[in-house]
Every structure is written in structure tokens, then in C-alpha cells.
């Protein structure tokens, strides 16, 4: 099958537009076609009996195939054994899933050579989330000002058409925690986590396919009753106006009481925060000291996306998180439950970041929670001098002496 950027993405869109369960009043799907997916176990050579039926499970007695050969193993057991044998080869495993898919997720995987991150771990997490689809505690909803009065308290309202997806809500005593400093609101739970945001400035686009606004919330280790290193909020949407998006982001920050790191190449969101009295929520770029910031950066906060160093640090932050907290670990599976973000990580291209809104904002959240790593003058790990056991001698005179 083709890579997503070589026709695979178009076919995936056609397949999704042909879902027979999503039809209009005239009984038509969006494409006018019906999609059909046949898993590999239904027609895998060597595992079909003489009557043409697939041998799914390992039979108690050998089953005869159409060529007279005996079938002693079920095709599903065979497939699982192949998967187990490729666990240490992430590229080979990914290609096996693509060529012999048992789910549509397998069939529409991208080529692993295109991916910057560990695809095995990402798809392990995606498959785990798929299996637990009905039991994962991800709630869709909206944030609202209490009684509609701005700058009071924010409440979360579950709503099937809401733009937010949330997997954790702080205990009541941590909600809406903020304090005033120099006449500006500051977050009260900065020690618990942070947000990252990829914003946009223009309300509409000509083809209605402009990039989405994206927001991610991430916790960090703290002594509070808060899960550590967990993405708890995902927002990937483009409301009718940019102002709605700005207010959505502001309400999320106020509700969780956490600061936010925003790309400052599109500054309208940052101006919105400052105008509303929440400049204290907008983080300054962590890689520069305050006296080295530009006038605009001091006024608004935020971080540029044009620097190559920032791009590399951003990608490295996601890579480290995937290796440590995504997929199967010794203690079980990771608690990254947002499928759209995982899928965006899987196809992230550092040289063409425009389409990857979810990756941008999630990476900024990771940088915000680990800002000490990017601080100028942060301690660098010095290379350790190795003692090879070779001594130096002073050979002057009749007797050698050890120098070191």
C-alpha cells in the first residue's frame, strides 16, 4: 500500500467518506460509495480449509487445506507469533501491520521511514486506546464562565459537541486557582503543569481548510494530588471566529490555573491575554534570560517557531516523551489517551510542520513543563574522565616514580 503522502491519504479520505453508517437524508454517503474492509485472517493463503472457510483459531485436530496439506495452526495465532517476533524491529513490525492488517488502523498506517518518533510505541498506545474505547475516561465538553460572567470562575460542562477533550479534572481546591501580582492575574498551579498552544490569527479561510487552533495540557511531577507527566487536555478545532478560540484557551488556563507557552509568530492570542489582564499566564520563552528578550517578547511572552534550535528542541521533547510515557512499559500502558494527537505524532514532519497543529502544541506543553532544560546557563553534563588504569611515570634518575 502507498505511503500517506503518495496517495494513501486520499484513499483513506475516500474510505472514511464511504462509511455506510454515516448517510444523509437521501441515503447517500459523502462519496456515494460504501466502504468495505476485509481483515487479513479472512483470506490468508495457507489457512483456508477445503470448503473455503478460513481457519481462525488453532484446531484441536489438523484441518485439510484445498491442496491436501494439513493445517495445524490458526491464522490468528500465526499472525500474533509474527508480531511477537518483530517487537524488536519497529520498522519491520509497522510494515507487517500495513501489509497484513487486521484493523483499518493497521491498513492506514504510514511508512515508518517517514516518522521521526518511535512508531511502535505510538501504535501500541493507539491500539490500546482502541481496545479500551468505551472505558477510557476521556470526556468531551466545553468551558464556560460561571453564570456567563467573565473573569469570575470557569466551569467545565460535558457536551458531545464540545471542542475540548479532557481526561483529568483537578480537585475542587485546585480549580480556578490564581492570584494578583502587580495588577495582573497569575496562575496558582504553575507547579502542577502547563499548556502549549499553536494559535491562528485569521477567523476564516478561502477554502475552509485552514489549520486548526490547537491546545494541549500536560501535568508534571508535584506534591499535589495530580497525576504526573500526563496529557490531560486536547483541543484541536477552528471555531467560527478567532475570538472564540482565544476565549476557549483563556478559560482552560483559568480553570486549571496553569500557565501557557504560545508560538508568538501569531500574536493575537497573546494580545487577548494581556488585554484581559492575564499576561501572567503567558510564559516567556525559556531559552533566554529576561533582559535578553525583545520588547515584544517582554510585553506579550511566547516563543518563536522560526529558530532551528527551537524546532530541534521541540521535536526532541516529543521524542523523549514518546520513549518514556507512550505505549507498553514495565508498569503497563501509558496514559496518553488522545488518538488525534498520537496519529499526528506518527506522521510528524519537522521540515513541514504546518499541518501538524497537535504536534506543535503538545511539544510546546512539554517544553513549558521542562523549561529548566532550556534555560541559558543550565548545567550541562560534563564528560566523565575514564580511568583506564594506565599510570604515568617519571623516569629520571635510576628509579622510576609514579606521577599519577
PLM feature segments, named:
Residues 38-43:
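Conserved AAA+ ATPase "SRH/arginine-finger" region at the nucleotide-binding site
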Residues 282-328:
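Short alpha-helix plus adjacent loop in nuclease-associated cores
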Residues 12-13, 163-168, 289-299:
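Short, charged, low-hydrophobicity "junction" segments
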Residues 16-27, 289-292:
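Short mixed-charge
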Residues 1-10, 23-32, 44-285, 324-404:
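RNase H-like, metal-dependent nuclease domains and their acidic two-metal-ion catalytic environment used
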Amino acid at each position: 500500500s502507498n505511503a500517506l503522502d503518495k496517495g494513501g491519504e486520499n484513499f483513506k479520505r475516500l474510505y472514511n467518506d464511504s462509511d455506510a453508517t454515516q448517510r444523509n437524508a437521501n441515503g447517500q454517503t459523502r462519496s456515494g460509495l460504501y466502504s468495505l474492509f476485509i481483515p487479513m485472517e479472512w483470506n490468508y493463503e495457507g489457512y483456508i480449509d477445503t470448503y473455503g472457510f478460513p481457519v481462525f483459531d488453532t484446531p484441536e485436530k489438523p484441518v485439510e487445506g484445498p491442496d491436501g496439506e494439513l493445517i495445524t495452526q490458526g491464522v490468528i495465532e500465526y499472525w500474533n507469533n509474527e508480531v511477537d517476533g518483530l517487537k524488536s524491529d519497529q520498522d519491520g513490525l509497522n510494515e507487517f501491520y500495513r501489509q497484513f492488517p487486521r484493523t483499518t488502523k493497521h491498513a492506514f498506517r504510514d511508512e515508518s521511514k517517514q516518522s521521526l518518533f518511535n512508531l511502535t510505541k505510538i501504535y501500541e498506545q493507539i491500539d490500546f486506546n482502541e481496545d479500551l474505547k468505551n472505558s477510557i475516561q476521556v470526556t468531551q465538553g466545553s468551558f464556560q464562565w460561571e453564570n456567563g460572567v467573565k473573569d469570575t470562575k470557569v466551569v467545565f460542562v460535558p457536551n458531545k459537541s464540545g471542542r475540548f477533550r479532557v481526561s483529568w479534572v483537578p480537585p475542587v481546591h485546585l480549580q480556578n486557582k490564581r492570584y494578583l501580582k502587580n495588577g495582573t492575574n497569575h496562575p496558582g498551579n504553575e507547579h502542577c503543569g502547563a499548556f502549549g498552544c499553536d494559535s491562528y490569527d485569521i477567523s476564516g479561510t478561502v477554502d475552509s481548510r485552514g489549520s486548526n487552533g490547537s491546545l494541549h495540557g500536560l501535568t508534571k511531577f508535584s506534591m499535589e494530588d495530580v497525576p504526573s507527566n500526563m496529557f490531560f487536555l486536547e483541543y484541536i478545532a477552528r471555531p467560527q471566529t478567532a475570538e472564540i478560540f482565544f476565549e476557549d484557551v483563556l478559560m482552560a488556563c483559568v480553570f486549571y490555573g496553569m500557565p501557557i507557552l504560545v508560538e508568538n509568530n501569531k500574536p493575537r492570542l497573546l494580545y487577548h491575554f494581556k488585554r484581559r489582564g492575564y499576561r501572567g499566564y503567558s510564559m516567556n520563552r525559556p531559552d533566554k534570560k529576561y533582559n535578553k528578550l525583545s520588547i515584544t517578547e517582554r510585553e506579550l511572552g511566547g516563543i518563536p517557531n522560526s529558530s532551528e534550535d527551537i524546532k530541534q528542541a521541540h521535536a526532541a521533547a516529543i521524542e523523549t516523551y514518546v520513549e518514556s510515557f507512550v505505549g507498553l512499559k514495565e508498569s503497563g500502558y501509558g496514559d496518553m489517551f488522545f488518538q488525534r494527537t498520537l496519529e499526528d505524532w506518527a506522521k510528524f514532519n519537522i521540515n513541514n510542520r504546518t499541518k501538524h497543529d497537535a504536534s506543535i502544541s503538545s511539544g510546546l506543553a512539554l517544553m513549558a513543563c521542562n523549561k529548566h532544560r532550556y534555560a541559558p546557563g543550565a548545567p550541562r553534563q560534563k564528560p566523565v574522565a575514564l580511568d583506564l588504569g594506565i599510570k604515568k611515570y617519571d623516569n629520571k634518575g635510576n628509579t622510576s616514580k609514579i606521577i599519577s
